[in-house]
C-alpha cells in the first residue's frame, strides 16, 4: 500500500514537473528559513558548555547613573568594580556572583624573542570558574588566594597553547601577555564565540592588571559586568528584590554627592539579556516574541500557498471525473 502511494505521488509529480518543482522548492525554502530563525534564537538562550547554566543566569552587563547637577542627563555603560561588589557581589540569595570585564579585548601574546599574535582576552575573578563550566585539558583555574594576590597567571585555550608552545601540555610555562610575563595555570578546550559571556581565548585575574582603574563618574562606572548564578529559576524574583534593596541602600550613600544608580529592572535573565542592545533602554521581551511569531507565520504561509496550489491543480485535472 505504501509503495502504491509513492508510485502515485511520483506519477503526479511527473505530470506537471515545473509546478511540482516550484512547489517543492518553495516549501523546502520556507522550512529552511523557519529552522534558521529558530536556531538563531536558540543559540542565544539554549544552555551549552561553558554556559550550561543559562537557565539560572541573571546578567548585569550595563547600567546608568545620573547626578542632580546633570540636568536630567545620565551616563550609561558598564559599572565600576566598587559598584559591582557593593550592589551584586554582596547579595546573599544567589549561589554565586562573578565579576568580569564587559568585553573581550584583542591583546598580543608571544614568547620572548618571537613575534606576537592577537588573542581575545577576558579578565575575571575566581568565582568565574564556578559560574561557568569549562572543560580543562590540563591544570586548573586560579583560586581565591591567587586572585587576591593579583598573581600574573592565565588560563588559555588549547589552540592558544598549541600556537605558543606547540603542545597543549603547557602548565607552568611562561609567555608574554601585552609584554608582561604570565604563567599558564590551566588549559581548556576552545570556546565558541556563541558563548557570548564566557567566551575568550585567554583569561586572567583582573587584579593582575590596571583595568579596575579605568573608571568615570567618581569610580561608580567602569569596565566591569557581572553574572549571577541562581540556585534555581524560582529565586529570580527574590534576587531582583534583594538587588533593588541594595541599590536603594547604595543610592543613599551616593546621594551625598548627588549621584543615583539606575538599573532599569536589571538583572536580566538570559532571554532578556540576549536582546538588550543599550544601557539606557529596557528591552521589551513580549514585543520581541510577537515579532518572532509574525516571522514564523509569514514563513508558514509560503508552504501553505504551495500546498493549496498543488491541490487546486490536481482538482482541475480531475474535474471531468468529479
What do the predicted segments below correspond to?
Residues 16-45:
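Short, strongly hydrophobic transmembrane alpha-helices
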Residues 37-108, 115, 222-225:
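Membrane-proximal extracellular/periplasmic loop immediately following the first transmembrane helix
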Residues 125-141, 152-283:
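Mid-to-C-terminal secondary-structure elements
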Residues 6-18, 22, 305-322:
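Intracellular coupling helices
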Residues 9, 24-28, 297-300:
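Residue-level signature of the transmembrane alpha-helical core
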Residues 100-103, 110-143, 147-148:
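The feature marks short, hydrophobic/small-residue-biased sequence motifs that occur predominantly
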Amino acid at each position: 500500500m505504501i509503495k502504491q502511494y509513492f508510485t502515485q505521488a511520483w506519477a503526479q509529480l511527473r505530470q506537471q514537473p515545473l509546478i511540482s518543482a516550484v512547489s517543492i522548492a518553495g516549501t523546502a525554502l520556507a522550512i529552511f528559513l523557519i529552522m534558521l530563525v529558530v536556531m538563531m534564537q536558540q543559540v542565544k538562550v539554549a544552555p551549552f558548555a561553558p554556559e550550561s547554566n543559562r537557565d539560572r543566569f541573571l546578567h548585569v552587563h550595563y547600567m546608568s547613573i545620573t547626578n542632580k547637577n546633570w540636568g536630567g542627563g545620565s551616563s550609561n555603560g558598564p559599572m565600576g568594580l566598587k559598584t559591582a561588589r557593593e550592589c551584586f557581589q554582596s547579595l546573599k540569595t544567589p549561589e554565586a556572583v562573578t565579576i568580569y570585564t564587559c568585553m573581550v579585548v584583542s591583546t598580543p601574546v608571544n614568547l620572548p624573542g618571537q613575534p606576537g599574535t592577537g588573542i581575545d582576552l577576558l579578565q575575571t575573578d575566581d568565582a568565574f570558574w564556578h559560574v561557568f563550566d569549562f572543560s580543562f585539558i590540563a591544570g586548573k583555574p586560579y583560586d581565591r588566594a591567587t586572585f587576591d594576590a593579583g598573581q600574573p597567571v592565565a588560563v588559555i585555550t588549547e589552540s592558544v597553547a598549541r600556537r605558543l608552545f606547540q603542545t597543549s601540555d603547557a602548565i607552568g610555562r611562561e609567555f608574554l601577555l601585552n609584554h608582561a610575563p604570565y604563567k599558564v595555570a590551566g588549559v581548556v578546550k576552545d570556546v565558541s564565540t556563541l558563548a557570548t559571556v564566557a567566551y575568550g581565548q585567554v583569561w586572567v585575574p583582573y587584579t593582575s592588571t590596571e583595568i579596575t582603574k579605568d573608571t568615570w563618574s567618581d569610580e561608580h562606572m567602569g569596565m566591569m559586568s557581572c553574572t549571577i548564578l541562581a540556585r534555581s529559576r524560582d529565586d529570580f524574583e527574590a534576587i531582583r528584590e534583594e538587588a533593588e534593596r541594595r541599590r536603594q541602600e547604595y543610592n543613599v550613600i551616593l546621594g551625598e554627592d548627588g549621584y543615583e544608580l539606575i538599573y532599569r529592572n536589571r538583572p536580566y535573565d538570559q532571554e532578556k539579556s540576549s536582546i538588550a542592545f543599550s544601557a539606557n533602554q529596557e528591552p521589551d521581551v513580549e514585543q520581541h516574541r510577537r515579532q518572532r511569531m509574525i516571522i514564523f507565520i509569514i514563513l508558514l504561509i509560503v508552504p501553505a500557498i504551495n500546498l493549496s496550489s498543488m491541490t487546486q491543480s490536481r482538482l482541475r485535472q480531475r474535474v471531468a471525473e468529479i
